[in-house]
Amino acid sequence: MVESPVISKWVRDSLEIMDIRAEQSGLPFVTHRLTPETDNTFWVNLLGRGYPFPRKKLRWCTDRLKIQPVNKFVKEQIAEHGEIILVIGTRKAESARRAKTMAYYEKKRVRELLSPSSTMANELVFSPLEDWTDDDVWIFLMQYRNPWGYSNTDLLTLYRGATADNECPLMVEKGLPSCGKSRFGCWVCTMVEKDKSMEAMIANDDEKAWMTPLLEFRNRFGDETNDRGRRSFRKMKGNLQGTYKQLHHGPYLKYWREKWLEELLEIQKDINENGPEEFANLELITIPELRCIRRIWVFDKHEFEDSLPGIYKKVTGKKFDDPEWVGSEAFRKEEWDILEEVVNEAVNDLYSGEEMLFEMVYSLIDIENQATSLNKRKGITESLENCIRKTFYKNEEDATQYYMDRVIRKKDLGGKYNSLALDGRYDYLNEENEDEDEKFYLKSSSRNQYNDFKEIDYA
């Protein structure tokens, strides 16, 4: 997955020991490590579907990677037991926003110390540490032994290593930072400009220098300056949206999805071979995720070249294991290369500037090929028409002009239109991600606050 490998290992080892100690002590404790569905992981969305890297106005990751797995597990427990009490370590001292939220639900308590859940019925929330400070937490951990025998000192060392000065002052001066200010999250997180915790861990400990490629890779794909040019000028479903003479770009292009996958596999291989022994089997991306990405590329994006197995073999030297794969027998990489050559010749000789022609042709061929049997012919005409609508533009300039003309036509006819597209004073960069893709990315979300999110066509 995408948690910091060091923290992930610490958690796995701790949970394993917890299970062992619980069984030895005859205690009814069972640990569950929650993970997202394979179809909803970070890499499947970023590299498979081409979702833009998460940012403040397009934060698709938290719901899919954290909230949905937790909600699914909680619902299963409520279905089995009727009611549950969720014990969590949230504290008011973590942030002003957290304190405000906790104070709000504190007023709604149905029983002493038990707050109602903000999203689920029959779930009560108990926060025993709600009034603890960072220092309270560390003093407790250093004074009391871990009940399942795991080292709290090792945990302190982890947090100390993640601070810029490699120190963790406890109750010395109010102005000094505590270890609790270090934040451990996903190593791929692009919600912040810099991953200061990982930078500090690498700077403070030579033995963690093996994580440097992870940090550098995160900075490369999270480069907002060059991000727009790496993405299609169309949205995820092929529609256009924009502001004054500018289109809002959508998913990542094929080249970048393949390039980043290859880089990720190379980093994984390097860590396995040259990193610490305990990370010799580290998986930055799993085989099930790779299989899911392969199916999205071939069946959803019509990239019948089927490049993933080749990328995998190039990096690892091994054949890609996918026993349930059933691909096309008629169209593969050889046919893809021939088609690309023919289309490029046509563009050079007859259709100058037709940048979308190759995508239109290979998509139409693949759509027809996927519907060869009679039971799959239903809706084939509509699918072909939709494909043509997505790719009939000559290039981005042509698509932009088409979009602007359409907005003007809607205005002239008295229809609903995107007024921002006609406002030359509007800075599209400030609102680029408040668009239909955000609704598309969140449409399948299980969070209650997104259930009533309706899609509006402004253009």
Please give the residue ranges for each predicted region.
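Nucleotide-activated chemistry modules centered on ATP-dependent adenylation/adenylyltransferase
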Residues: 1-459
